[in-house]
């Protein structure tokens, strides 16, 4: 490990690896560090991604694709089921990944592009001089180091310290954190070509239960509930109840517990010499909590802007503002619209959800026009259409794609 690089990336998740790969391909000297000894472990999500956007970053590989999903089922509290094709199911439906292999494949691509990758290497602080980030202090195998750089990219996840060290407000209110629990189960006995989403305030207050196929009759089965709506029952207890009632033959072989920020965007994600990407920048989707593709998209933008700034010889916040502007115009717009949807739906009663599902149950979501969708929503819930009016204006203008591309 050298004492100076052009770019240091903190965190080797999807966002960090794409940032490192992009910067290295631009000819920059890049160091990417990961605090854990194994990249991709532990798993923090349901592992679903949309096909179109994934292919913008990496060619799909059977080694890390567990399931090729053709659609999703949304199940209302009374059991009414809506089927949606993959193209209409959102940014987390398409492929179900094996994250442990996928994350390492991305890190390997960054290394092949020229980045230096160091595991079991923990950032302990930033080096800040004249109000500018100029490197990091780190711990590697029990030894302390100071490594300087022209730009630091913080991709250190939900618990990010990098942004906080730089004076960026990244704290999230408990009410804006989705508390999650997930099992990997065998003997799942579900259709391995579909993802399942169960809605209802009894099974998941202000949230949902998901089932993502993993191949070989296995599935990720998880729950996410909004912190502000969590009652006496903990997510793990609600999940246990769901599995007992709906998957009595399932066998638990792995468990993950964590939290996902669903707060929408934070005020800023840059400082002099610094950019934040992924969960560190609160770029996850407020509805689903999914953030793999958003992190990768943001990482690519950050890597490109890092190269531009370094070539220009100016890594100030004014130059890095281009990163802020670019991700907010794309990723940020989708996040803001998802936040409107989330804030609308968390106030729905089970009766509201049942009514909506009943009105949409026979719709073919692969061929429906926007106008017919609006008519169906209006029939189901007139207030809903009014609450979401701003989003539909953007869709009609073609400014939002919601990651529904095939």
Curated annotation (Swiss-Prot):
Coiled coil: none annotated. GO terms for molecular function: flavin adenine dinucleotide binding; geranylgeranyl reductase activity; oxidoreductase activity, acting on the CH-CH group of donors, iron-sulfur protein as acceptor; oxidoreductase activity, acting on the CH-CH group of donors, NAD or NADP as acceptor. NCBIfam families: GG-red-SF. Reduction reaction proceeds via syn addition of hydrogen for double bonds. Pathway: Membrane lipid metabolism; glycerophospholipid metabolism. GO terms for biological process: glycerophospholipid biosynthetic process; membrane lipid biosynthetic process. Its cofactor is FAD. Gene3D superfamilies: D-Amino Acid Oxidase, subunit A, domain 2, FAD/NAD(P)-binding domain. Keywords: FAD, Flavoprotein, Lipid biosynthesis, Lipid metabolism, Oxidoreductase, Phospholipid biosynthesis, Phospholipid metabolism. Its EC number is 1.3.7.11. It is an enzyme of class 1 (oxidoreductase). Belongs to the geranylgeranyl reductase family. DGGGPL reductase subfamily. This is Digeranylgeranylglycerophospholipid reductase 2.
């Amino acid at each position: 490990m050298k004492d100076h690089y052009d770019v240091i990336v903190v965190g080797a998740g999807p966002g960090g690896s794409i940032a490192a790969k992009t910067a290295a391909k631009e000819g920059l000297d890049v160091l990417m560090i990961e605090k854990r000894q194994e990249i991709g472990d532990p798993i923090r999500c349901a592992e679903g991604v949309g096909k179109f956007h994934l292919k913008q970053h990496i060619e799909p590989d059977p080694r890390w694709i567990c399931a090729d999903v053709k659609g999703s089922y949304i199940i209302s509290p009374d059991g009414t089921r809506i089927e949606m094709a993959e193209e209409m199911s959102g940014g987390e439906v398409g492929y179900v990944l094996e994250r442990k292999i996928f994350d390492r494949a991305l890190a390997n691509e960054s290394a092949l592009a020229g980045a230096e990758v160091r595991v079991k290497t923990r950032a302990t602080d930033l080096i800040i001089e004249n109000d500018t980030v100029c490197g990091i202090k780190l711990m590697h195998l029990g030894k302390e180091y100071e490594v300087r750089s022209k730009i630091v990219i913080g991709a250190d996840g939900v618990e990010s310290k990098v942004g906080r060290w730089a004076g960026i407000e990244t704290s999230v209110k408990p009410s804006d954190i989705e508390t999650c629990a997930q099992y990997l189960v065998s003997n799942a006995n579900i259709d391995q070509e579909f993802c399942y989403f169960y809605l209802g305030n009894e099974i998941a207050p202000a949230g949902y239960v998901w089932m993502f196929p993993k191949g070989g009759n296995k599935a990720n089965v998880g729950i996410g509930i909004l912190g502000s709506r969590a009652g006496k029952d903990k997510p793990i207890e609600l999940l246990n109840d769901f599995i007992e009632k709906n998957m009595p033959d399932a066998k638990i072989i792995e468990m993950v517990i964590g939290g996902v920020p669903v707060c929408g965007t934070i005020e800023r994600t840059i400082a002099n010499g610094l950019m934040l990407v992924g969960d560190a920048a609160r770029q996850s989707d407020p509805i689903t909590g999914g953030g793999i593709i958003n992190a990768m998209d943001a990482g690519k933008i950050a890597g490109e802007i890092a190269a531009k700034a370094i070539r220009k010889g100016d890594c100030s916040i004014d130059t890095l503002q281009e990163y802020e502007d670019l991700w907010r115009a794309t990723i940020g717009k989708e996040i803001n619209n998802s936040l409107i949807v989330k804030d609308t739906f968390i106030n729905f009663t089970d009766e509201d959800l049942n009514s909506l599902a009943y009105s949409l149950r026979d719709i073919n979501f692969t061929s429906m026009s926007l106008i017919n969708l609006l008519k169906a929503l209006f029939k189901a819930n007139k207030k809903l259409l009014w609450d979401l009016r701003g989003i539909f204006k953007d869709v009609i203008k073609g400014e939002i794609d919601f990651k529904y591309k095939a």
